């Protein structure tokens, strides 16, 4: 008989599921190919999770490169923002921006996302402002802030527009979790893998709209 997931574990699992489905849904909306989404949560609330995003794209101009980098930044920001969405159905689900910022900055576990963000935004700044003096630290800081603020705002718009899809798929992911029996050890881990093929058969995935990086 399936052991019922304790409420505290389910609540934690839903937050992480929303994080991964935020990456997944926003990536698909921006034209990235996607694969599996996985989630493991232990009884003591440790977790491992991932959403497979396929980054191969044909890029033949600087403008296409800038668009690709902005799209990648939006996908990275989307995880932390989606993690803050309320689980319950409401007229409009809103991102908690301060909590999303704390998640990205490593206080709540998305350090890898932010490490990629830091690197990609420098690359985007190098391309967007090629004439800036490398010694002008104040100018570079201002340019990085302009890029980050613009992409952050666009991510918020996209995540809030797709919030119901993200949280619905997050619930599907958690509903599929089963406790894993491990030989010689107590069963203490709930796990799920939704393959790319399984996800693409789901109606909410098929209904994800195609969106632009720029509003």
Where do the model's predicted regions map?
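Soluble catalytic regions of large protease machineries
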Residues: 2-215
């Amino acid at each position: 008989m399936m052991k019922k997931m304790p409420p505290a574990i389910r609540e934690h699992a839903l937050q992480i599921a929303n994080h991964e489905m935020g990456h997944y849904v926003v990536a698909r909306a921006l034209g990235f190919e996607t694969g599996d989404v996985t989630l493991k949560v232990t009884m003591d609330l440790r977790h491992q999770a991932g959403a497979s995003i396929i980054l191969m794209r044909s890029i033949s101009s600087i403008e296409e490169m800038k668009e690709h980098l902005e799209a990648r930044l939006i996908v990275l920001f989307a995880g932390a923002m989606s993690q803050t969405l309320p689980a319950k159905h409401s007229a409009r689900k809103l991102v908690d921006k301060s909590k999303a910022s704390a998640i990205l900055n490593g206080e709540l576990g998305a350090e890898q996302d932010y490490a990629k963000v830091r690197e990609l935004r420098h690359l985007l700044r190098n391309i967007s402002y090629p004439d800036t003096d490398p010694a002008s630290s104040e100018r570079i800081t201002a340019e990085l802030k302009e890029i980050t603020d613009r992409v952050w705002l666009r991510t918020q718009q996209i995540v809030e527009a797709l919030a119901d899809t993200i949280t619905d798929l997050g619930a599907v992911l958690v509903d599929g979790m089963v406790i894993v029996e491990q030989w010689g050890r107590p069963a203490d881990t709930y796990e799920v893998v939704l393959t790319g093929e399984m996800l693409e058969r789901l109606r909410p995935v098929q209904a994800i709209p195609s969106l632009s990086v720029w509003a």
